[in-house]
Amino acid sequence: MDIEDVMNKLSLKNKKVLNRSSEYSRLIKVKRPMGLGPLEMCKPGACIFVACKELSIELNKSQLVRVLGTNDKLFEQSILALYTILGKKRPPYSIVEISNTFKLNSTICESSENLLKLYRTKILGGIEEVQSQFTNIDDGIFSAASVYIMTQQHSINIDHTLLLSLVDCSQETFQRAMNAITQCCYQGESIVKLKKTPPKNKQNTILRSPTSILISSSSTLNNTTTSTTTTAPKSPIPIPSLTPISQIKNLTTKPIVSPSSSPLLSSISPPKVLATPTLSSSSSSSSSSSSSLSPPLSSNPTTDLSSTNEPIVFNISSELLPIPPTTTFKNDGNENKNNTKNCNIEIIEEISNVDESPFNDNSVKKIEQSNPNISNKKRSRDELEKESELGKSQPPQPQQQPQQQQQQQKEKSVKNKINEGDLTLEQERLLIKKKKEQQFNDWKNSDFAKSKPTPVNATKQLTLDSFFK
């Protein structure tokens, strides 16, 4: 669209405007032969607008933008580009022009003009010579600031970015101008702050689901094959794992552990086997019976089988015997009876070997001196009789483990599982909950949880203590 077509649509018939605008378009072609890019469609309208402003001819800006088929921002950018290419200083915008660009009411326009006049009379005593040395109130920044203050006072939202582009200033200088007007005219009561531009919505990298493309190892030169796999997003909250990492890595390369070398089986004590050997008539029989049995593994010295009739405990290794879940032993009275019978038979056999002399105390002493085992057998017989009587009076009771031992065994098994890394996620979460509850209970019972006395209560208590002394 040429300049003449735009002027015909606007019904503008002024040769001065046409000549000046055509001269500006020629200069732009000379200085910028590549054109203005996206602002090229606004070039004829910008040339007409600048020419009318220099010749002080009224022009409807909104109608001009509508004829060009653009928006206000692009049109303002094209005007700025034209002033920079021509090397001219842009004239400041008036309050009427700013209100026309934002299509504001006449009341806001009048109130903003009155506000600017009041600021001009109050600042630096209203002396124009002093004002010209420090500030330039005729600049478009103060007029734009007064318009923005009045729009905020009447709760009207306008695009402050477009306002800053009209004035061609930074956000900080515009805020300083608004603060100066409000502090002078409103006595610092109504300070209007410029709304900051919201930052661009950048997607958080943590919330993105990571995708990794893996190339398969079977890739040839002619037919390349790739396999795409997607991995699930990591949880933002890390779950604490109680299983050690060194054991998790070595799960696949674990050797086969024998039952004796494993820590779980070594912690369990092997079962105790009760052996009740029969008393023999001579020392040779006792030696043969002891040799048939396996030697004890414990380092403690063992008692002679022929000397006592009490049951002897042998510690047998876990490799020889299987580990039963529970082992209970009952003391029956029948065993004691059999033992007493054997003792009686052996004593009678030894007495028969003695000479047929009168049976006196001296003869008994001689028999005991010749065979010292007889005295021990007599003692053992008396002990067995007492035990049999106690067994009849008190029936045998099965051994029951107390609850504390059971709890300790459970805790040991859980600790072993934690050390080996055999716990599941649910079991680990339950352990974490129990630990937190225990910590809370400990804190509750401690002195930190108790309420501290306030200074008022403390003073009352001091007065009461001093009164009762």
UniProtKB/Swiss-Prot annotation:
Gene3D superfamilies found in the cross-reference section: Cyclin-like (1.10.472.10)
Bias kind Polar residues: ranges: 454-469
Protein's UniProt name: Origin recognition complex subunit 6
Summary of the function given for this chain in its UniProt record: Component of the origin recognition complex (ORC) that binds origins of replication. DNA-binding is ATP-dependent, however specific DNA sequences that define origins of replication have not been identified so far. ORC is required to assemble the pre-replication complex necessary to initiate DNA replication.
Basic and acidic residues biased stretches: 380-390, 409-423
GO biological process, one term: DNA replication initiation
Quaternary state and interactors: ORC is composed of six subunits.
Membership in a protein family: Belongs to the ORC6 family.
Organism listed in the record: Dictyostelium discoideum
GO molecular function, one term: DNA binding
InterPro entries, alphabetized: Cyclin-like_sf, ORC6_cyclin-like_2nd, ORC6_cyclin_first, ORC6_met/pln
Keywords, alphabetical: DNA replication, DNA-binding, Nucleus
